[in-house]
């Protein structure tokens, strides 16, 4: 089983991402978080250690890039996939360790490639 964290402050988008992942990765065990702080709490307080994290970038409070930096430190083996509706964030993701950048409008077409790039399949 591959534990995959999904963090998106829009629950509908998180559920769409979850469904897309399940269609292309049978071994996925997904867990959705609506805030970066909820995901960080699961990691630091519950010992949750996802092997993959699919992170929206634009979120209230802490953005997905800052969340990725913290996950990089807390769970070094976690492969980060950024998911956003805004191409303008592309340059900023290089401040973190990540494996893929997916535009939300291309989710169904790209998520399989992104998951394969993590090396967890």
Language model features with spans:
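Acidic, metal-coordinating helix/loop segments flanking the phosphotransfer/catalytic sites
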Residues: 18, 32-52
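Alpha4 helix (beta4-alpha4-beta5 surface) of REC/receiver domains from two-component response regulators
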Residues: 66, 70, 85-102
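Short amphipathic alpha-helix used as the core "switch/output" element in two-component signaling
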Residues: 41, 65-77
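Two-component/phosphorelay signaling modules centered on CheY-like receiver
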Residues: 2, 11-33
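The feature encodes the CheY-like receiver
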Residues: 60
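Acidic catalytic/metal-coordinating carboxylates
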Residues: 35, 63-66
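Active-site residues of response regulator receiver
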Residues: 8, 55-56
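C-terminal output helix
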Residues: 106-115
């Amino acid at each position: 089983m591959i534990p995959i964290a999904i963090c998106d402050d829009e629950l509908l988008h998180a559920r769409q991402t979850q469904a897309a992942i399940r269609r292309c990765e049978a071994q996925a065990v997904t867990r959705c978080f609506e805030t970066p702080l909820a995901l960080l709490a699961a990691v630091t307080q519950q010992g949750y250690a996802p092997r993959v994290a699919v992170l929206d970038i634009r979120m209230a409070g802490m953005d997905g890039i800052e969340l990725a930096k913290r996950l990089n430190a807390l769970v070094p083996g976690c492969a980060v996939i950024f998911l956003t509706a805004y191409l303008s964030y592309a340059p900023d993701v290089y401040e973190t360790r990540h494996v893929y950048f997916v535009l939300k409008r291309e989710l169904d077409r790209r998520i399989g490639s992104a998951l394969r790039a993590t090396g967890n399949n």
